[in-house]
């Protein structure tokens, strides 16, 4: 009987630990989005293909770049 109780406790602990683990997601990068060219939040991505000359590019370390906002030199569109 003790072995059955221990087995149930161990299986329950295994189930809880397995469900608590976070899923790892691999983010696909285009060549111009690799970490060396895009580390941290910045607005200096003018030469990147993800934005045009009037939009700011923001890249978070380990994520794809996002084009947000309009540069002051372009005014409102």
Curated annotation (Swiss-Prot):
In its UniProt record, a GO molecular function of this protein is:
toxin activity
* Tissues with expression: Expressed by the venom gland.
Is the keyword Glycosyltransferase assigned to this protein?
A: no
Coarse class of the primary localization is secreted
User: What does the domain comment read?
Assistant: The presence of a 'disulfide through disulfide knot' structurally defines this protein as a knottin.
Q: What is this protein called?
A: Delta/omega-plectoxin-Pt1a
Task: Look up the signal peptide feature and give its range.
Answer: 1-20
Q: Which residues carry this modification: Cysteine amide?
A: 74
Q: Which UniProt keywords apply?
A: Amidation, Calcium channel impairing toxin, Disulfide bond, Ion channel impairing toxin, Knottin, Lipoprotein, Neurotoxin, Palmitate, Presynaptic neurotoxin, Secreted, Signal, Toxin, Voltage-gated sodium channel impairing toxin
Q: Where in the cell is it found?
A: Secreted
Which residues form each disulfide bond in the chain? 38-51, 45-57, 50-67, 54-74, 59-65
Q: What else is known?
A: Negative results: has no significant effect on voltage-gated potassium current in Drosophila giant neurons.
This protein's GO cellular component annotations are: extracellular region; host cell presynaptic membrane
């Amino acid at each position: 009987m003790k072995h059955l109780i221990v087995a149930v406790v161990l299986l329950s602990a295994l189930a809880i630990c397995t469900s608590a683990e976070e899923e790892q997601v691999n983010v696909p990068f285009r060549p111009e989005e690799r970490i060396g060219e895009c580390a941290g939040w910045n607005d200096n991505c003018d030469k990147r293909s993800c934005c045009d000359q009037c939009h700011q590019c923001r890249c978070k370390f380990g994520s794809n770049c996002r084009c947000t906002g309009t540069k002051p030199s372009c005014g409102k569109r």
